[in-house]
Amino acid sequence: MVEGKFVASHPTAFVVTKLYTWMGAALAVRNSATGAAVMEVETVEVGYRKLRALVLLDAASHRPLLTVEEVGTNRKRWQAIRGGGASRSSRLFVAIDRTGFFETGVLLDVFLEGNSTVHPDYIVHGSYFKGTMTVSRGGGGEAVAQIGMEAGDKSSALSGEHTYRVNIGQDVDQALVLALTVIVDQRNNYDVETSSCSCNHSSRHASRSTGSHSNH
């Protein structure tokens, strides 16, 4: 769990929007019911290999909540770390891209920190291109969230602008599901330039080096 406030005793819904501004790509997360800003996403490059890191910021305080970093150079693996640090002790999960050249149903395997088995705690499955994806507990467990991509106009799609509607079940870590939504966007739209988020938060996290600590 990232923070207690991101676990609700009732189902919740969010809108994740990626737009391109003069500063580059900007991702924003809003509560579907109230329209209130929940998170903003800053994209930076990390280390000498220029790997991507996506920093999920609290919209009110601009405090880093979760940092999603690429691990390795094949764009197939990400790790999520609480806050803006790089300590393995703060890692929340590792996500591994399981698709080949064609979608086969399972998009991501997600291993929570402490899971040293080959069995994922969660999977993201469905079809990105059809705009319907589900987050389920691993091993054929129950669905905990739905990620849907809105069908926008052709000009928006060609420019890489997307809107996702995310429905999350009760007692599910919203920050984890929202981070997976950002990863799903990144794995299918690897065109985000290094930029500041829409709040003009500085890219001070870019000096960190990234390494793989996972057994997966």
What are these model-derived regions, one by one?
Residues 1-53, 59-64, 73-76, 83-216:
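Low-complexity or membrane-interfacial segments used for flexible interactions
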